Design a protein with these regions (language model features):
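Short histidine/acidic/glycine/proline-rich micro-motifs that form metal-
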Residues: 11-14, 146-147, 184-185
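Residues at the starts of beta-strands that form the adenosine-phosphate
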Residues: 3, 38, 136-138, 174
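N-terminal beta1-alpha1-beta2 submodule of the flavodoxin-like/Rossmannoid cofactor-binding fold
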Residues: 1-97, 102-106, 110-113, 117, ...
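Substrate-gripping "pore-loop 1 plus following alpha2 helix"
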Residues: 118-124
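Glycine-rich phosphate/pyrophosphate-binding loop and the adjoining helix
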Residues: 150-208
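Cofactor-binding loop segments of dinucleotide-utilizing enzymes, especially the Rossmann-like FAD-
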Residues: 9, 143, 180
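Short, glycine-/small-residue-rich phosphate/pyrophosphate-handling segment
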Residues: 124-169
């Protein structure tokens, strides 16, 4: 039995969000084809994660070094480590997130900040940082209304690239990826574009 964590970074309803359609398609098919696995869903908007701030920064440093932290620092560090432990304990993780204003939602950025901890997801060496979770299986589901995979908008794509670069820093270099793009740019083909992505998400889920 595998432990699977589904991380959802979009609070729009499915009828308004291609990203959520991908998420629901993947989740439904995964549960149908892997009934023995333990699935946990984490909705980052429902979680209302506090921003990564001075208390969390100092708290994580002090806790990691065995230094006494203030009550506020300890509380912040414990919160971040709760999410980190959940991530580390999962055999597979599925992220679903949109491209908003060229990047990822603030909720996902905050979550990734929680996970980005030296000694846990990466370590420093004389040769440079080395990822520590390269054996984790990852799927990324994303929808973006314009075309960012090529052409003049490609340089502005700081959403999927950001997440992939963060994962690579942790040693995860080959995540499975399903992207839907162009459904707002080409409204006459929007439904076909989205449904193609929904099918690809389901196909990936069946073999993930």
């Amino acid at each position: 039995m595998a432990k699977v964590l589904f991380v959802k970074a979009n609070n729009r309803p499915a009828d308004q969000s291609a990203t959520v359609k991908l998420y629901e398609s993947f989740l439904k098919t995964y549960k149908e084809t892997h009934p023995e696995d333990a699935v946990t869903e984490l909705n980052l908007f429902d979680a209302e994660l506090p921003y990564y701030d001075l208390n969390m920064l100092n708290g994580l440093f002090k806790v990691g070094k065995g230094i006494e932290a203030t009550a506020e620092e300890q509380k912040a560090a414990d919160l971040a480590n709760t999410y980190l432990d959940q991530f580390l304990g999962a055999d597979k993780v599925v992220f679903a997130f949109p491209l908003w204003n060229f990047t990822i939602p603030a909720q996902l950025l905050t979550y990734l900040f929680y996970l980005n901890q030296a000694g846990k997801t990466f370590k420093y060496t004389e040769q440079g940082p080395v990822g520590l979770v390269g054996d984790k299986k990852i799927a990324l589901l994303q929808a973006r209304g314009g075309v960012y995979s090529e052409g003049p908008m490609a340089a502005l794509e700081m959403s999927l690239n950001y997440v992939k670069n963060t994962l690579a820093f942790w040693g995860i270099n080959n995540p499975e990826v399903v992207v839907v793009e162009g459904h707002n740019q080409f409204p006459d083909r929007a439904e076909a574009i989205i449904q193609d992505g929904v099918k690809r998400a389901a196909d990936l889920a069946a073999k993930f």
